[in-house]
């Protein structure tokens, strides 16, 4: 997956580089060049959250992360009950308060932590985090 710096479109990086670097030049965010359409969406909808997440990430990242490694990263990031109650027929909502911290960050931050753990070279790394205000 190639991503570009939204402030400098010619700056391209891989997913791995974007995770490790965080921000691009001039504090630009990284964004994918394009999203390829998912095939077999109906089949994906039959899967539970974690296997579905693995399939979607595999589609987005291609071979940038080995499939067994990606599967392990996703399964370890979401090792808690993921609830998606039906709101109306055919419409579900992802409840973001079932993780270890009982906050939405369990979905984004835990996977990001797995990515950082997998991608870094073992040298020193500083990770700065903050609360959103409602949990800290």
Question: Can you describe what each PLM-predicted range is?
Answer:
Residues 1-136:
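PLP-dependent amino-acid enzyme catalytic core
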């Amino acid at each position: 997956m190639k991503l570009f710096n939204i402030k400098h479109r010619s700056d391209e990086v891989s997913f791995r580089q974007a995770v490790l670097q965080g921000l691009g030049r001039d504090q630009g965010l990284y964004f994918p060049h394009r999203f390829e359409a998912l095939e077999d969406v109906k089949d994906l909808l039959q899967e539970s959250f974690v296997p579905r997440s693995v399939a979607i990430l595999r589609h987005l990242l291609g071979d940038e992360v080995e499939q067994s490694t990606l599967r392990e990263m996703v399964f370890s990031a979401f090792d808690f009950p993921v609830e998606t109650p039906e709101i109306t027929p055919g419409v579900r909502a992802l409840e973001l308060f079932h993780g270890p911290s009982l906050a939405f960050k369990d979905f984004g931050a835990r996977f990001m932590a797995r990515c950082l753990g997998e991608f870094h070279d073992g040298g020193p790394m500083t990770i700065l985090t903050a609360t959103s205000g409602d949990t800290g």
